[in-house]
């Protein structure tokens, strides 16, 4: 079952005070209750989806015994995300985050104008998408798909969630994933949630399996979709095997 995060895709727009990673963890719990009320579930989260799984683990650790039978965290993190370096890569890290926060807050007050400029500068935006989303050369259709998806996300939504990315600090919560088969995957050329984040998650989640996809970028689920599917199939087999021993 797939769903759009709040304020994304076909889901309704969230109020700004509820645009947080913690709220996304609560949303995940609600989706499970409404859509899969009984039986084991396997959680798979990419990027902000992975952060949602981490927040869910912090809020509802008991469900990793009662309901959650396995988890996959793909190109994500539980904290330490340098959003200042991400938005302002040429600025020293110590001043990058304050500048980035100020820049995003200022632009958020003119979100409509920003969205207009994004549409007007589609060629530049497409180049930026290719740079940040992918590592190796990929078909143009992949870049166009991601660029279209990003351009359909209003800047006001980006600005609303931005503070939550910098404040994320939940590595202490991921140990509960050690109780179920867990998979951590990331491309070695990820420029958003770099491979170091996945290595740290793997180190904190006992018995987890780490898969590093050489040369792949942040959108590894597109760039290396066949490998991703193979690893997820293997995780499902591990989950079914463990469920069979209960």
What spans do the regions from the language model cover?
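Conserved alpha/beta-hydrolase "acid-adjacent" motif
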Residues: 191-197
């Amino acid at each position: 079952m797939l769903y759009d995060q709040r304020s994304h895709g076909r889901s309704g727009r969230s109020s700004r005070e509820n645009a947080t990673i913690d709220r996304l963890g609560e949303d995940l719990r609600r989706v499970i209750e409404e859509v899969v009320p009984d039986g084991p579930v396997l959680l798979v989260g990419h990027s902000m989806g992975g952060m949602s799984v981490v927040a869910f683990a912090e809020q509802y650790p008991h469900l990793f015994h009662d309901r959650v039978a396995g988890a996959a965290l793909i190109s994500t993190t539980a904290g330490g995300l340098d959003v200042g370096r991400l938005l302002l890569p040429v600025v020293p890290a110590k001043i990058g985050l304050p500048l980035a926060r100020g820049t995003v807050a200022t632009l958020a007050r003119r979100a409509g104008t920003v969205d207009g400029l994004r549409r007007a500068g589609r060629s530049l935006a497409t180049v930026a998408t290719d740079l940040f989303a992918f590592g190796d050369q990929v078909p143009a259709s992949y870049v166009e798909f991601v660029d279209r998806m990003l351009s359909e996300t209003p800047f006001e939504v980006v600005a609303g969630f931005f503070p939550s990315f910098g404040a994320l600090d939940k590595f202490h919560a991921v140990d509960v994933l050690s109780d179920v088969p867990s998979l951590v995957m990331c491309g070695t050329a990820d420029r958003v949630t770099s491979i170091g984040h996945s290595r740290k998650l793997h180190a904190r989640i006992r018995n987890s399996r780490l898969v590093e996809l050489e040369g792949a970028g942040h959108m590894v689920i597109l760039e290396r979709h066949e490998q991703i599917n193979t690893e997820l199939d293997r995780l499902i087999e591990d989950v079914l095997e463990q469920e069979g021993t209960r």
